[in-house]
């Protein structure tokens, strides 16, 4: 299913109906497309340190580049230092937003080259205002310290689709 940005308007009214000031916790924050539409105390965690680096970088004033060419993309893929820039390139300049899943390229409906990097930059900067106040934490869901009486929204990796870097046990998750 991927990003929840399009369906958040349908899910959130149901989920927030009885929230009553409780902390909103997302152990699998991913693209932050639910947490950015929630007010109040929020914790967004992810085991992928690059996800957390990108969002904390944005919170601290990191401005992504408007353009990254294919050679710069390849260099970033080899670098792998955990910085907001490498994180942005790894997600924002990759095919379908998949972590270094291939340099994103293509054309618009009018045949003009698309600038996926600029599109990603605009999207995350638009989202940035709604991420203020979110506490982003690099943690597995198992080790995340969740405040008592929190409302927890889990959107774990999907079973049988994309292979994740460190693997993910759905059996362990359902026992959690």
Give the positions of each predicted feature.
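A short N-terminal beta->alpha junction/helix N-cap motif
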Residues: 2-3, 42
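Conserved alpha-helix/loop element of class I SAM-dependent methyltransferases that forms part
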Residues: 3-20
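Conserved proline-anchored active-site loop of SAM-dependent methyltransferases
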Residues: 11-12, 24-38, 44-49, 92-95, ...
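A generic secondary-structure signal
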Residues: 13-17, 126, 176
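Short helix-loop boundary/capping segments at the starts of domains
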Residues: 17, 33, 57-61
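Short helix-loop-beta connector
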Residues: 17-23, 147-148
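Class I S-adenosyl-L-methionine-dependent methyltransferase module
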Residues: 40-136, 142-143
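Glycine-rich S-adenosyl-L-methionine
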Residues: 165-176
